Amino acid sequence: MQAIDNLTSAPGNTSLCTRDYKITQVLFPLLYTVLFFVGLITNSLAMRIFFQIRSKSNFIIFLKNTVISDLLMILTFPFKILSDAKLGAGPLRTFVCQVTSVIFYFTMYISISFLGLITIDRYQKTTRPFKTSNPKNLLGAKILSVLIWAFMFLLSLPNMILTNRRPRDKNVKKCSFLKSEFGLVWHEIVNYICQVIFWINFLIVIVCYTLITKELYRSYVRTRGVGKVPRKKVNVKVFIIIAVFFICFVPFHFARIPYTLSQTRDVFDCAAENTLFYVKESTLWLTSLNACLDPFIYFFLCKSFRNSLISMLKCPNSATSQSQDNRKKEQDGGDPNEETPM
């Protein structure tokens, strides 16, 4: 197995710029393997629990869409692991470029979009904690969810179709080598659109959590001295969303800008290009980590999910009865504490 590949000429240097692939062929496949098993177990469990919970709030609808997106992303990991470790033949690399890599980014931006919607929902819960969802709002949330999936699918499908060139050799170093001329143009357009999606949701998260922090501080000032410690502890939980967003998605999108410049323009020397490559791969792994961190959001912020999980862990046979109890509460008017209060 070749550990070092010749890539490109470094600006201002006639020697070839080489890159050590031991990290990407050994370390990252191991890290993705860990994510695959942890993510598959936790998200399969989350999927089972959410199938037992009725979609009685916008929050739960968005969480259900998130767990589906995460599970789809996780299912792409084995193909990436085999491809990066050079354990598969040329057709596997072609399949990764044409299908699984597209699905990976497709699900990434779906998750980003739903985290933005969940953030807006948490802000509304902070300012109007006793407002309940009505059927009209639930229908709107479902329609919005379908539109997000449809929009991202329509963006991603051409990337699959236009990755249609036959590889010149068995070892395809870049997926761009397999794209048609228009495929490269479309890929660039999609990259710009995805950047816009991220930055819009980035602003949503920043603005909403600034307002949430102000509201929680006002609430703390009003209730200071009353001794409502449990409420203060609950309030802190809402910040898990911004923590997941910043850990998983922000580093990649900040690293992506200089990395793209290093691929399209001669503005960095060889050492800088290699550093940017490793930074990009590291931050891409962090985006994958999101699939393992989202279950913490479900557990800490969704009481129905938390109760069902605890019941399942205590006694697996009681999970069905817990689900029936939840459904009975919903028929009787719902559990006012179904979501973690602000």
From Swiss-Prot:
Coiled coil: none annotated. One of its GO terms (biological process) is platelet aggregation. Residues 51-61, 119-142, 208-233, 299-342 are cytoplasmic. It is found in: Cell membrane. ADP binds at residues 93, 97, 105, 156-159, 175-179, 187, 191, 256-259, 263, 280. Glycans are attached at residues 6, 13. InterPro entries: GPCR_Rhodpsn, GPCR_Rhodpsn_7TM, P2Y12_rcpt. The chain crosses the membrane at residues 28-50, 62-82, 98-118, 143-162, 186-207, 234-259, 279-298. The transmembrane domain is composed of seven transmembrane helices; most of these are not strictly perpendicular to the plane of the membrane, but are tilted and/or kinked. Agonist binding promotes a conformation change in the extracellular loops that leads to an inward movement of the transmembrane helices. Antagonists can bind to an overlapping site, but block the inward movement of the transmembrane helices. PANTHER family: P2Y PURINOCEPTOR 12, P2Y PURINOCEPTOR-RELATED G-PROTEIN COUPLED RECEPTOR. This is P2Y purinoceptor 12. It comes from Macaca fascicularis.
